């Protein structure tokens, strides 16, 4: 059988935060499928990337005082601990700001334009009058025009999955300032999804039963025809897709339109191809030749919240730019906790991946539990702590791991680690195990790991029944039963090897440890049929896995301590610590305001004539005119910096500085307050 050639991706995480458990679930699902493919001898390239573009990244980077590129790089630096921690083995990890993605995105756009799928239109676009910028979709919120759900984003509804223009929102508001946005005109670029060629292609591609799950196809079908919304209104057909955004924007510039950028959802999926190209470039392989192979299969694992982009826009972009369309879009549901409850850290129902690892919880417990739940459909799966403990302790350890511990010691101690011959009853049992190789591999192919786990656990039950019936611990006590003891224990070890192969895509670390114990190279599915044989030497068994404890689960779901809001006095952080010698360099003196007058041509400054006990006065300008009238200050005592170098200003020479206090946020906390010493202080006195 010819090896398959497969290209696999997961959805790109947005590079503005850490991975959450939904990311980890998807990556484990895809990683398991990739491992199962490789165990059949198939050649797989498994790539990921950070989704690096868009206004949210730009704004977050600005707040952090970083460039968008540095902000994304800092987020990406934290990815490895998650991926390594849960044994998720991508072949490459890139980001959508890579040179490869710039090149591919721009070329795909030009190819679509040449095919007649791009047109420009002057549109009305929301503009934030307070922030003085056009608002990206994700910074506009309002009521969905289709189902009327509240607080939906400006590009798609998370309730009914509709995609629309931001101007379609009802009662929109800026998510940045809360202001009501105003409409301004701008020229935008559209991908003509309503073109009859696109409609014909997408109708066939999504409904032919080959590329998406049946339940996903049924949902997509609604978008092609007339839809009745919950409020009784109707919507019809596919809309053209606005693929451009106005500067300022962090993204890929449209090649023939300076100041215009691709909407993030255009270049994000192209990032799949770009990460693959980056990988192949590193290997010195030809990307174009790889993608041109008609036997190449292309799989995308995604969540059900981004079906629209991956089943309409993405295949149409690829098709009409002359590229290969995806073989399959593999859609999964969300993860809930405790029988459907949404995750919330504050309520103690959040599952933090890093906390899980920090508590010393085995990553393969979670891989196994998710494997036992995921079934290839886009159904939500629930993490129930009691169910988790039962499946790990009773099934994974009690049924599977313990098989080896019940037999390995006898082989090592009584027979020098050498396996023996297997008699007829053992051969019959092993034959039953080998017969399930086809169905289990088929379950992995269908991403129905729940069925693969279920079938494997049923086989574990058969093996444990064999152990209970033959009682090797009693055989070991009986004279003349050495051959039978070696026979039974050899059968158990061979059965354990087969079961380990079946679980290897889900439990790669356990499988590696079992391979070391059995002294065999990493095994493929085909090697289920090839027994170790009499005389094979095995090593000493080491315990493979601890049981999960209630204390670990309690700690995992313990709500975090209430956050104590950091107090920032006056709206500004305290300055870095200085020494007494540093402070002594500043000469602060009591000064009397002999004269105070407004400055002609300035609304902010007052001119102060100060007596600092020097036998002569000083001229000082101070920006306090908004708070004080000249007559209010004349004759008052204040504090001045006496050794500040004179500064030449537009209105004259300033020979010092008067000290005054104000809040950092003058808009929220207006006011400037000149310092005034207690009675008794005299001009010229130094402040220590």
Swiss-Prot record:
GO terms for biological process: methionyl-tRNA aminoacylation. Residues 582-688 form the tRNA-binding domain. Binds 1 zinc ion per subunit. SUPFAM superfamilies: Anticodon-binding domain of a subclass of class I aminoacyl-tRNA synthetases (SSF47323), Methionyl-tRNA synthetase (MetRS), Zn-domain (SSF57770), Nucleic acid-binding proteins (SSF50249), Nucleotidylyl transferase (SSF52374). PROSITE patterns: AA_TRNA_LIGASE_I, TRBD. Keywords: Aminoacyl-tRNA synthetase, ATP-binding, Cytoplasm, Ligase, Metal-binding, Nucleotide-binding, Protein biosynthesis, RNA-binding, tRNA-binding, Zinc. It is found in: Cytoplasm. Coiled coil: none annotated. A motif ('KMSKS' region) lies at residues 342-346. It holds the Pfam family tRNA_bind. Its cofactor is Zn(2+). The keyword Cell division does not apply. The keyword Cell inner membrane does not apply. GO terms for cellular component: cytosol. InterPro entries: aa-tRNA-synth_I_CS, Anticodon_Met, Met-tRNA-synth_bsu_C, Met-tRNA_ligase_1, Met-tRNA_synth, Methionyl/Leucyl_tRNA_Synth, MetRS_core, MetRS_Zn. Zn(2+) binds at residues 144, 147, 157, 160. ATP binds at residue 345. Its EC number is 6.1.1.10. A motif ('HIGH' region) lies at residues 13-23. It catalyses: tRNA(Met) + L-methionine + ATP = L-methionyl-tRNA(Met) + AMP + diphosphate. GO terms for molecular function: ATP binding; metal ion binding; methionine-tRNA ligase activity; tRNA binding. Homodimer. NCBIfam families: metG, metG_C_term, PRK00133.1. Belongs to the class-I aminoacyl-tRNA synthetase family. MetG type 1 subfamily. Is required not only for elongation of protein synthesis but also for the initiation of all mRNA translation through initiator tRNA(fMet) aminoacylation. This is Methionine--tRNA ligase. It comes from Acidovorax ebreus (strain TPSY). The gene is metG.
